Amino acid sequence: MRSTAFTVSVNGQPVDVAHAAASYDWVSFDVTGPVEISITAAEAGFWDKGVDIQPWRLGIRPVRQGKTIRFHLAAPAKLSISRPGDFLNNAAMLFVFAGTPPQPPPRAGPHVTIIAAGIHRESLNPKSGDTIYLEPGAFIFGSLNLFKVGGVKVLGRGTIVYEGTQDPTTDEGWMQKPDWHCIGSYDARNVQIEGLTCIVRARTWSIQMKDSFQFTYDDLRVIGGNPGNANQDGMDWLGGGGTIVRNSFFRASDDVFGIQGNWDGYTEEAILAPGKDVTDILVEDSELSTSISNIVRPGWPRKTFSSHNFTLRNSDILHGGIGACGETFALLGFWGAEHAHGEHSDYTFENLFLDDWYSLVQMEMDQDSALPGLHGFTFRNIWAPDQPPLADSNLSGDISGVAFDNVKYGQTVATTDADLPLIVSDGAKAPIFESPKNVVAKFSFDPPVFGVGQVVRFTAEASLGAKYTWLFGDGTEATGRIVSHRFADAEGTMLDGEAGGAGRFRVLLHVVGKTGSGTGNEDWASQGLVVVGKWREAASSAIQTLPGLTWQIFPGNWTELPDLTKEQAVFNGQSPSLSANPQGFVRYAAVWDGLIDIPADGGYTFHLLDRDGARLVIDGVQVARTGPPFAQVCGSPGNAMRYDRGAMGLRAGKHTIHVEGLHSVSEGAPAIYWEGPALPLTLVPVTAYSYARKDVVTR
């Protein structure tokens, strides 16, 4: 269990680092006040390209010194620490669980079992009325089986490590039988689970509840990873409900939460068999992450069941799955395709932060019965602080009563379908868009362009009786409606700003009304501000140009973007923007060269999106490069959309631009967005591109 990938100390005292699954490690310790945390990576240069500490809402930014990072943690928290953009199934990630001390063990009695610290190779099979207390440091290699029991409590601070015998190449994890999940239940009632860590190394559904009711999970930590990167949901309901999940952490390799009426395999008979209702689920105050798929997935093609009263609130979406499995992945993916049947209502998503995410909502209900389908879905106070959506949202079919109430990207509230963006089709009713009603978080700053050490004045929009808290993305914070701040460096919040000579800082504003947070009387705003450490001068104004870009085509069967300096283009041309004519080739790399016209001096962020692989270079500096291709699954063609960004300090005028894009299995050219002084996040317009004119003299 012990990991050598990281060395961790808390207030100078070493803390054991354990290996979880895949390339994930974790540490767990208790705190009673603020602490200083030090993390040293075994790999040389591990942190050189940056550090990403989530949830972003906390505004944590470490100090980096070689292989070591250090940061201050003010209160108990569950953190994910990795390198920027590295959060998929092969990512090297460290999860830090800083908790409050557990309750003392219960008094001895005939129905009380105390499991001491150490290794125990056996499953837990409590009977009705039993209490099991796992001491800190107790490791159970097995399962927690809750079959036809009631009144069970599992308390303490122990760990269950599940290493099952499931086929790693397919889904056998759906089966409902003992020793098949970290926690498995059937027809169980009134169960309390507190302080438990689940490590899941097999390709199985991590926590499965069939026809079970009145479960409460508090301070649960679930970490799953498997080579197939699939079928390892965080928590599934097969009928039942009445569940509360609070103050918990999930890292899944499939949907974090799955809701079905039943699941007895993939045969025609099993898929078409009607399932039982799922009702009354509350998930709150939790951190949610997956390497693939959705955060919440109710429904499946052709399945019949109903569900009501699901709430996810006051939580952070650290990592959403990218790509698609028949349906694009999202915060909510409701896949009621191929004549699924049922009524699903009263789903609420409230006070949620979207850190690394893909799309907001995908809802499809292809139903031909008289049931009312999907209705009463509310998305309220959804804050995406620092990344745009990578895919459109969709409402399709028998859907009504969808409301988007203060869905906010940075400082901008979505008030139209185009703002999300959202496609409504096949009879779905148009959604309602609303803006915040009580307090509003919105701010301005001056000057619009600044460098290291310069004073920046921040002014929040006034809300009567509100309190204002600023997190500047450099590890510092302030209170008050109007504050001043100096940024001490140009490395950015993620310490990834050195290459371009400028760093992007994620500035957050939290506004709380008179009645306090958690009541709907709060709002957040965010903006990425670029601190310029080094200016890039514009090209000579004497250069004569033509509109558009030049391009070259490099045929090849690459699976990742190659080093094109070693390749030979077969033909070339010019185009208005990032388009090219491959002249019949279907697998190739394209290169575009030219100039990009910067409208004003300032710190700019460039956002790069592409499916097969792309690279953006400005003034000879690599600004962004998307990650390796990530295949979509379940028959969805092509690769998922990948994303990267970078910041630069650019003088007004023309700057050289070089773009590379691979075309292997997906359609579409790279997309480049920019933002800067008085320039909101938007696609770089065609008019910004040009290339140097070359006159040819003929005799």
Tell where the protein language model's regions lie, with residue ranges.
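Short coil/turn motif common to extracellular beta-sandwich-like domains
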Residues: 31-36, 449-457, 600-603
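Extracellular/lumenal mature domains of secreted and surface-exposed proteins
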Residues: 437-535, 676, 698-699
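Conserved structural position at the C-terminal beta-strand
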Residues: 83, 511-513, 659-661
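A general beta-strand register signal
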Residues: 9, 133-134, 471-472, 617, ...
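Extracellular/periplasmic carbohydrate-active domains that bind, remodel
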Residues: 1-439
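Acidic/polar, compositionally biased interaction segments
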Residues: 504, 522-523, 528, 533-699
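Edge beta-strands of extracellular beta-sandwich domains
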Residues: 87-104, 518-531, 670-671
